[in-house]
């Protein structure tokens, strides 16, 4: 078998039967294509992010495993050691459950240190054959195993404590909801589960009935829909884990391009799993002015009552008479349930950034600049639930859109926190109350002499908002914290997505729809 470079810049392999195979290199891995195997070059950022996260996870796991070995005694039962997934060599096991060409598995084997075994699984004969060829092409036969099987069945076969994986990657075409139940069972304690979903129309509220069927939640179209989608997915994963006395710790949650991607650590513990009810809830959303208020499902007792939980008393801050918004008097909607706890681990994200900054230029990944920019924004994000768009709020009251720095400064000068969001370049994420936010725009309207009687219809949301008095002192003086660090450093924060072939690619022919996974089996060709 010989390899040559073709006119397009890719490589071409000519096998003994004279068949030409296109070879593409990404990172340190090469993959050859000559059949209907799914590959999307636009997802290079997704794969680079996964490699970066796994490198940090592997380093953390090795350090933790060494600490556990030092604490280990001769009388310690082996069952506990198996539960914690401590290998004698400290190496990790990875499952690429929907492997397609095997590119992810190959990159993990060549770019992530301390990896002992990788299972590259797929339910397509063509894909498995391609994985086997690519494993040989990259010379990683001692690490990567091509495996034919339904992803759900494969994960269920590895739910035993001594068979679990330290890292499980789910990157399906569309939703990952059908794989979550089996995935949370086959991850080792303190292991990492990495999940992608590309059904953004569902997660962003275009079809609430489909969202309910897939994720057991409902939502509507709103400016912060991408963060809502992330929180819906996290809640679905945590709910699946809770059934097995497990719970999740979100490490990084990203919404970019045409998909959401979450990295969560899976823990085991009945006491902590019960606390999940305090981390989820619904959100009241105004149909007029878009004001929001999260409502937690359960509250935990205090003092000696911490083991007891109760349903909290309903105290709405934006709901008035007739279940209408107190700011604009228009109806309220309720979305959820969603995950209300923090969706990022700031110490983990800081470690990722330090790793990226210390990487020599010659060893940097293909999307290094974008990784640094997005993770810097993530690290600056407040943990407060959801965000507003400053231009949307200005549009409600029909005033000229103020500069984002001016709005941020007014919030900071009032003594509250504010940040942007990696999901949206116009996002305002803050812990300030809604009345202060509307006071800011009432002040803008006052400064620009906006006449609500002439500019706004009397039944509109903006008319009612401008009719209320300003009760807070609004100071637009530039605050030092109003400019984001990522912007100061001129980092790549938001990618232009309108290039050729951008978006999810067509599903490979012969692949099995996720809705049929586990319900039909075909004879595998050995």
UniProtKB/Swiss-Prot annotation:
Protein name per its UniProtKB record: tRNA (guanine(26)-N(2))-dimethyltransferase
Annotated family: Belongs to the class I-like SAM-binding methyltransferase superfamily. Trm1 family.
GO molecular function annotations of the record: tRNA (guanine(26)-N2)-dimethyltransferase activity; tRNA binding
Gene that this polypeptide is encoded by: trm-1
Record-listed Zn(2+) binding positions: 286, 289, 325, 328
Example of a GO cellular component annotation carried by this entry: nucleus
UniProt biased composition (Polar residues): 1-10
UniProt cross-references to PROSITE patterns, sorted A to Z: SAM_MT_TRM1
Gene Ontology annotations of biological process type: tRNA N2-guanine methylation
Record's keyword annotation contains RNA-binding: yes
UniProt entry tagged with the keyword Metal-binding: yes
Reaction catalyzed: guanosine(26) in tRNA + 2 S-adenosyl-L-methionine = N(2)-dimethylguanosine(26) in tRNA + 2 S-adenosyl-L-homocysteine + 2 H(+)
Annotated TM spans: none
Residue segments, region Disordered: 1-20, 498-526
